[in-house]
Amino acid sequence: MELLCCEGDTVRRAQPDPALLLDDRVLHNLLTVEERYLPQCSYFKCVQKDIQPFMRRMVATWMLEVCEEQRCEEEVFPMAMNYLDRFLAVIPTRKCHLQLLGAVCMFLASKLKETIPLTAEKLCIYTDNSIKPQELLEWELVVLGKLKWNLAAVTPHDFIEHILRKLPLPKDKLLLIRKHAQTFIALCATDFNFAMYPPSMIATGSVGAAICGLQLDVGETSLSGDSLTEHLAKITSTDVDCLKACQEQIESVLVSSLRQTRQQTQQRNSSKSVDELDQASTPTDVQDINL
């Protein structure tokens, strides 16, 4: 008798729930509670003495790379950064503990959002074993205590579907717009300037930036440029000028990120070329070597 294995790597997902997406009370409740989960202060000025903004960016980039490599749910990374910012807003932390804190925050966020969460052992491997699983588990309890076990934070991803369904967008472009908006949200999470922005504003600005960047026609000719911004602001009850500034800031961060990536690529290519030249010009005669 032959056995047939039908198991696959595909994670089963629930279908979009109309009871949640078509009821404006859900959006209203999200807008009501979202600010409860924001950092209470700009902690680099008044709490942290050892940690600098560039260090946060470095650990955030590392966390994003881990989440991408492990194919985590889109919500895991922004939620982990929310935990990290809220912790740093209340507890002075040494810079040698920052990566450990980042790993703990990913550990907690994946437990909340993933079907199969990240393991402590796997996260320790991503730190080149600079931390031990037991250390991570001990810090998990510390972080939970300082966050008062309030882990179900509202993130920009919670607003995406509510915003998209209220816009007259072509159905064949929805997936592309959603992916671009999710990329912008992840980008915002790596930048401390967005840490104290309401998630609804980041979500709305990301959707606006995605639509403008893709140069899509939004159904009605009247719904473009400033009118699109006004329509988006109305959906999430956001101030139009604040939303416009947020969207411009998102686009600016994107340009900066792309420029940085391009420079790094050029540097890698140039160093590779230099290595090849060095290799080609290596003297083959021992008498040519100047000791």
From Swiss-Prot:
Sites of the modification Phosphothreonine?
282
Q: Name one Pfam family in it.
A: Cyclin_N
Q: Which InterPro entries match?
A: Cyclin, Cyclin-like_dom, Cyclin-like_sf, Cyclin_A/B-like, Cyclin_C-dom, Cyclin_N, Cyclins_cyclin-box
Chief localisation class? nucleus
Q: Where is the composition biased (Polar residues)?
A: 279-291
Q: Where is this region: Disordered?
A: 261-291
Q: How does it assemble?
A: Interacts with the cdk4 and cdk6 protein kinases to form a serine/threonine kinase holoenzyme complex. The cyclin subunit imparts substrate specificity to the complex.
Instruction: Tell me which family the UniProt entry assigns to this protein.
Output: Belongs to the cyclin family. Cyclin D subfamily.
Q: What is this protein called?
A: G1/S-specific cyclin-D2
List the top taxonomic levels of the source: Eukaryota, Metazoa, Chordata, Craniata, Vertebrata
Q: What gene does the UniProt entry assign to this protein? A: ccnd2
